[in-house]
Design a protein with these regions (language model features):
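A short, charged helix-loop
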Residues: 1-23
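Hydrophobic helix-and-loop "lid/oligomerization" segment in the mid-to-C-terminal part
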Residues: 21, 26-176
Length: 176
């Protein structure tokens, strides 16, 4: 989008620059994934066009309740190898992005190279969100469960199994 603006010689105002920069941070998980030199150049362009850092932080704020809820769920995680964590949620129904956020947060912890979050996302559907810092190809693991994605970010949706059954299948695949 920034390249398009540059081609048109369009100078976005502060609000547009701020919103675009906030979107970039969301899309790249705070410049931690899917980030290239062009990503940083686009961010610099938006900063030069007066992206408001304070407003951006306000736009990206999450509620205290959501933060505390996610951290309570993260407490359920455990290590299955020296560098792989799994978090199995309770039987409540969660949004898929909640599972992804937990896996992303687990990757910020020391010694965790891959993280998997298992949770119910529909009445009869269990989802797995898989994230890796590169040491594990989570796409291959998720493909074995009829899922897909990328080497460092993948997911699967499974029907007809319990959380415990999905957890056991996942552990078997990881330990292969």
């Amino acid at each position: 989008m920034v390249n398009y603006l540059k081609e048109l010689n369009y100078k976005p105002d502060s609000l547009i620059s701020t919103i675009m920069l906030a979107g970039m941070e969301i899309d790249t998980n705070n410049f931690n994934t899917k980030t290239t030199a062009e990503t940083y150049e686009a961010a610099a362009f938006l900063a030069r066009n007066k992206a408001n850092q304070i407003l951006k932080r306000k736009i990206l704020k999450e509620s205290r309740e959501a933060y505390l809820k996610r951290n309570e769920l993260i407490k359920k995680s455990f290590m299955i190898t020296k560098d792989v964590a799994i978090c199995v949620l309770d039987n409540k129904v969660y949004y898929r992005n909640e599972l992804a956020e937990i896996s992303e947060d687990l990757l910020t912890l020391d010694k965790i190279e891959a993280a998997f979050t298992i949770g119910r996302t529909e009445t009869n559907e269990i989802s797995i969100s898989a994230r890796s810092l590169g040491s594990y190809d989570v796409k291959k693991i998720m493909q074995a469960l009829n899922g897909g994605g990328h080497k460092n970010e993948a997911a699967a949706q499974i029907t007809g199994n319990t959380l415990e059954e999905v957890k056991q299948k996942l552990i078997e695949l990881i330990k292969r």
